[in-house]
Curated annotation (Swiss-Prot):
GO terms for molecular function: rRNA binding; structural constituent of ribosome. This is Small ribosomal subunit protein uS14. Keywords: Ribonucleoprotein, Ribosomal protein, RNA-binding, rRNA-binding. Gene3D superfamilies: 1.10.287.1480. Part of the 30S ribosomal subunit. Contacts proteins S3 and S10. One of its GO terms (biological process) is translation.
Amino acid sequence: MAKQSMKAREAKRAKLVAKFAEKRASLKAIISDVNVSEEDRWNAVLKLQTLPRDSSASRQRNRCNQTGRPHGYLRKFGLSRIKVREACMKGEIPGLRKASW
């Protein structure tokens, strides 16, 4: 189990990403637009730097919904490999079974 503080930190990051997503996207569009003047592009870079660091989507970490484990995360299920295996063995995930060949 991950610490509660780590789960809370990730939840806070998710809120910040959602809050600033539109603003970040518009600033990045200005920065990458070659038709905008150099001064305006530089001002957009400076504004982007003033946004909170945790508002960047790349700062988020996928975590298991049950345990908060950061490694071995399977996107399809939203769980870690350990919890997917446990659920699979109990028959809780329809259509998923242990491989045999």
